[in-house]
Structure formats: structure tokens, C-alpha cells
């Protein structure tokens, strides 16, 4: 990615499971000056992932794209979901990009139920999170609650 998009900031960490105090400070500083952030890809569901997602979510004006393990953390952390919903009341600047399995975890529903009603499930996720949701399957359904749906 760095070669194809040299202006992208890539930050690596010593351990995938814990952040040192210095790494946490660096991450928080990077979030303050960033134009946008994508979080979740390559992360693991662990304390450092939870902390990074919380730090990014706390930057209210920072547009975020949350994918992969960022979504899995969000599904397990009610307080993070509330934080995102609250910040999106003013400005919708968080995009969630779940595939059907991640969408099922976000909604706490069986995957078969979500797959059988993928459009309705994507709309429900947008309503519950206050975020823009791009539900991915053979087609992609993009919606923000109360706004037109795009397929």
C-alpha cells in the first residue's frame, strides 16, 4: 500500500496485543492531524485494538472507516457503539463496511437471518449505530438511516 499510495500514513506496533504508553501517545497524536482514518484491517480483537478504536472514535471530527476486527470490537463494546452514535448525531462521518458475518455480529443475530434480509439488516445497522453502513455480499447495500438506499 505504501508504494501505491505514498502519502498514506502507515504505523506499525511492537506487539499486536498491547500498546506501550509511547505507542498509544503516537497513535493519539496521529489521529489529531489525520484527514481521515481506516481502522480494523490487520488488527486483532484484543485490548490494543479496543484502545485504538476508542482513541480514533474520540476524535469527533475525524472521518472513520471501520472494517474487519474494528467491527468485531464494535459488536462487543456497547460503550464504543454509543460513542459512535452520539458523535454521528452532528455529522455523519463514520462508515462501517461489514460483510454479512460481521453484520450479523453487529446486530447480534444469526447469520442466516441477516443473509435472508440483507437490505433490511443493513438499514437496521445504520439506524442502531447512526453510521453509514456498506453491507457487503454479492452486492453492496449502502445506507444511512433516513437517507436513500444505494445498491
List each language-model region with its residue ranges:
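Glycine-rich phosphate/dinucleotide-binding loop and adjoining beta-alpha-beta core of small-molecule
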Residues: 1-151
Amino acid at each position: 500500500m505504501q508504494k501505491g499510495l505514498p502519502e498514506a500514513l502507515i504505523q506499525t506496533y511492537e506487539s499486536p496485543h498491547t500498546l506501550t504508553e509511547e505507542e498509544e501517545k503516537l497513535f493519539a497524536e496521529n489521529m489529531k492531524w489525520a484527514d481521515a482514518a481506516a481502522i480494523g484491517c490487520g488488527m486483532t480483537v484484543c485490548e490494543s485494538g479496543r484502545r485504538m478504536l476508542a482513541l480514533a472514535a474520540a476524535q469527533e471530527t475525524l472521518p472513520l472507516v471501520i472494517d474487519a476486527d474494528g467491527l468485531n470490537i464494535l459488536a462487543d463494546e456497547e460503550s464504543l457503539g454509543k460513542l459512535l452514535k452520539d458523535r454521528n448525531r452532528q455529522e455523519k462521518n463514520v462508515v462501517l463496511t461489514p460483510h454479512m458475518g460481521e453484520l450479523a455480529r453487529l446486530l447480534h443475530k444469526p447469520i442466516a437471518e441477516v443473509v435472508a434480509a440483507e437490505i433490511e439488516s443493513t438499514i437496521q445497522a445504520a439506524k442502531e449505530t447512526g453510521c453509514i453502513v456498506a453491507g457487503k455480499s454479492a452486492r453492496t447495500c449502502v445506507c444511512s438511516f433516513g437517507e436513500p438506499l444505494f445498491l
